[in-house]
Amino acid sequence: MDVAKLAHVSRTTVSFILNNVPGVSISAATRKRVLDAAKKLNYFPNVAGKKLVSGKSYTIGLVLCQSPEQIYTDAFLPQVILGVEQAAMQQGFHVLLKPVDPNDTGGYARLITENHVDGIFLSGPRQDDKALMDLHRQRVPIMLMGQLPDTDIPFVDVDATAGAELAVNHLIERGHQCIGMITNAPLDYTSAQQRRNGYWKALRKAKLPANKAFIKEGNYTPASGFEAMKSLLQVTPRPTAVFIASDVVAIGAILAIKEAGLRIPRDMAVVGFDDIPLAEFYDPPLTTIHLPAFGLGWAGGERLIRIIQGEGLNDASLLLESKLITRQSSI
């Protein structure tokens, strides 16, 4: 039995749906019936043949601007990757994963110039990424995981500034007046800047000192959190609470707090950011800002494919509200 017979439609309709032909009006119910039939029969369109006909590769490049060590220790990114892959699979696209050295971001431009992908989903944009801006000027379809200020490149993100402000306000409401911060990444990354700005905003509204000595840089890994926390513990006066802008970085920071003989939260309250699956199993369970990693990956992948297919999107970008998840590390 072929897909057309199982779905009770013509072979032309099957071809339109599985090849994502633009400009064809097909109901959502019919589209779902065809995709379900194709899945049941383990049918996959011939990508090489589609490329010859359309000039497209039916592949999107998922670019991760982090080192392999950072990617392998990150509990957040796998959920993003899974979301992108699910969105792509539902539309008959493939995903090409491309880790990029943070100091050589231009390397991913070859994915486009060598005709490997039809568009790029980029996680962790940097303010000084010239290759990204060059591709944007060339009208290459791009979707960012995280906002890039002063550009019109579409993105999916949680309001990181508001989330950081929410996290620090929680600590202020618990009576803390000396609050440190460890960033998720170096401060040339926009995500780190946004979370730092939220930290500062909360302190200023509460008329508390915004001391730069209380901010230490993390770099996506537990090891960076451990070193940053050791440095923060040397600051006078020592903070009684810390906002750590990444749950993964918080793993190392919590270890440093315990090695210093301090108790959480009595001596040092801790709030993280991301709400990775392991956060509720930390010792103690981690108060954190929730990021729907899978949902952001899926939404970004789905929107990118619609852009590739030539759909005019007024809602290409997606900015979600932040949500505080309260656990024992801060109360």
Regions found by a protein language model. Name each.
Residues 1-58, 331:
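N-terminal helix-turn-helix DNA-binding module of bacterial transcription factors
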